[in-house]
Amino acid sequence: MYKLVLIRHGESTWNLENRFTGWVDVDLTDTGAAQARLAGKLLKEAGFAFDVAYTSVLKRAIRTLWHVQDEMDEMWIPVRNEWRLNERHYGALAGLNKAETAAKFGDEQVLVWRRSYDTPPPALEPTDPRASYDDPRYANVPREQIPLTECLKDTVARVLPLWNESIAPDIQSGKRVVIAAHGNSIRALVKYLDQISDDDIVGLNIPNGTPLVYELDASLRPLRHYYLGDQEAIAASLAAVASQGKAR
């Protein structure tokens, strides 16, 4: 049996302000850093150790991984920073307050933009300063692969090649893998692993800074999965994530 650990980054500054973030490179709050440290402590106490780590190229996920590694005394393990693990791109919604956007467009429309499988938000113009074409962290990414908006289907399309080419082979070679990423890149992986339908994925939320453990068989099919931590606190965190896109 293999184990895989997925961790959404701790609370970010724009999580706190209830803003659509996407590829904007915001940092953790003090609460987010504490969540990440607690995740590392829980993993260490549960006997986990890792051989390789994956994360995105956005600092909220990178710093979350640092805190986890620090708590586990595993700062030395190899880390792969992969743009394909970035949060989904929220297009022209980036920076907007979710509740204010819901008040303007309606809860239902914002829920579709946030959680539906195949409906992207309005795209950025290529000349928009929020576009990532000139960002040095994407210098080796073909321009046509750098998004101006994404739906979850698009996120799945960029995450799964990384899974098939790198992550899955690492796991099957016996390496113990941890992935610190984002709500929607993790939803993309969970959708694939658990074979969640396009309709049912709308209801899936991922809490900040909470280790999600998958136990996998030899073919990497899930045997079970569970969150580490206080289950009441996790339920409250999930409810908070679900309510972010509603008008106040």
From Swiss-Prot:
Transmembrane segments: none
Single GO MF annotation: phosphoglycerate mutase activity
EC number: 5.4.2.11
GO biological process terms, semicolon-separated: gluconeogenesis; glycolytic process
PROSITE patterns: PG_MUTASE
Superkingdom assignment: Bacteria
Active-site residues, Swiss-Prot/TrEMBL: 9, 87
Claim: Isomerase is one of the keywords in the record: yes
Chain positions recorded as substrate binding sites: 8-15, 21-22, 60, 87-90, 98, 114-115, 183-184
Keyword Secreted attributed: no
InterPro entries according to UniProt: His_Pase_superF_clade-1, His_PPase_superfam, PG/BPGM_mutase_AS, Phosphogly_mut1
Site (Transition state stabilizer): 182
Protein family according to the UniProt entry: Belongs to the phosphoglycerate mutase family. BPG-dependent PGAM subfamily.
NCBIfam families documented for this protein: pgm_1 (TIGR01258), PRK14115.1 (NF010713)
Assembly mode: Homodimer.
Protein name (Swiss-Prot/TrEMBL): 2,3-bisphosphoglycerate-dependent phosphoglycerate mutase
Source species: Cupriavidus pinatubonensis (strain JMP 134 / LMG 1197)
